[in-house]
Amino acid sequence: MTRKIKNVLLVLLCMIFVQGSLPLQAEIKPEADSPTAGIQKFFHALQLIRQHYVDQEKVTYKSLFELALRGLLKELDPYSVYESEEVFNKTKEETRGEKVGIGVFVILRLGSLEVLATDPESPAEKAGLKPGDMIRIIDGEPVNGKKLEEAARLLQGNVGESVTIQLYRPSTDKHMDLTIERQKLRIRSVTGAKILDRASGTGYLRITQFSQHTAEDLDKALADLIKQDLQLLIIDLRGNPGGLVSTAVQACSRFLPPEKTVVSLIGRKEKILKCFVSEKCKINLQDLPLVLLVNGSTASAAEIMTACLRDYKRAVIIGEQTFGKGVVQNLIPFGKKEAIRLTTAHYYSPSRQIIQGKGITPDIVITLTPARRFALAGQLNHHPGEIQPQLRNAVRDVQLERAIEVLKAVKLFRDTHNFEQQTK
């Protein structure tokens, strides 16, 4: 038994001994939320498991304490989770924009991992995995009953190793198995930057997620578009599962004056834990007309950007209702090399609107059929910013088409207004 576990057990035994001696003194009523009785009960259950469980190798103190910790967090909410040393290291790799896996973004829904998006040219995309697919079994382990982080980690591993997944595809009502080889992935967070219409100066870019490099990637894309006489901009957040709040704040800062509230983190008893404000940046396009494209796979940090620019009337939102993930997880170091990912707050928009469980309703709702949504999600990876690529079975991007129309109308209104002002 390790020294750490011995110390824990010693404390537990001391607490039990002290409580057992209380009847010899004056009666003391325990606090309503006192840990003493619970610790006694837990320790008793621990001993019973150790004495009677059939597979003795499974009930070491180390494994039991880890299982207890996982179970405790699992019952709180879908996002709180314990991260072992291995998992914690992978988390740090992901926030740097690098990871080993198959290149897929997932969310937990109905006991399965629902695919929100796949990285362009990733192993997942090459194997035929599509947005909307429901992953039910990973290397023989059912997803049902697992937390999001726990299930998603099963898709990761070492470079060159394969993972076998069993999935259900709602769009075709089919079940299938896929075996995919893991690779080292470099996450490209800003793609497809281009001028769509030179006459109006309508530009386009897609933010696939908010990673450590997003602000840098965004600045490069914007600088290139500005050189091409950018007058109007469409930012595509469809299929963006979120990421780092700090980089979403940086992205908003490019389109707002400095010191504007972007998002507030509200904790227990409505206490404001932190208020993120827009920053002063080299590239600032606070007067540039914007459209944001969103859908049901736009989540978390992407919803922060959407809600912020909507509240300040800086952008017209077009598409479908967003996902509705508006809770904050803090990664708290636990021990020397482990961590607990714990929900500590809710996101609130600048106008104090809550995102969690509600999502954001676009200003212009354009609902797609499941089949069209499914086809378009895959198409965006290779042909972002194209209304209808010259491909067999290509679908027309009616949401993008509407965005272009809206921005042209905005430009016409501005040009007319400016002309009237000049002639007065």
Region spans (language model):
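Bacterial N-terminal signal peptides that target proteins for export
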Residues: 1-10
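Short acidic, Pro/Gly- and aromatic-enriched capping/linker segments at domain boundaries
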Residues: 334-345
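Sec/Tat signal peptide C-region and signal peptidase I cleavage site
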Residues: 22-26
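Linear, non-domain "peripheral" regions
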Residues: 3, 20, 179-183
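Conserved functional hotspot residues or short segments at active or partner-binding sites
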Residues: 346-424
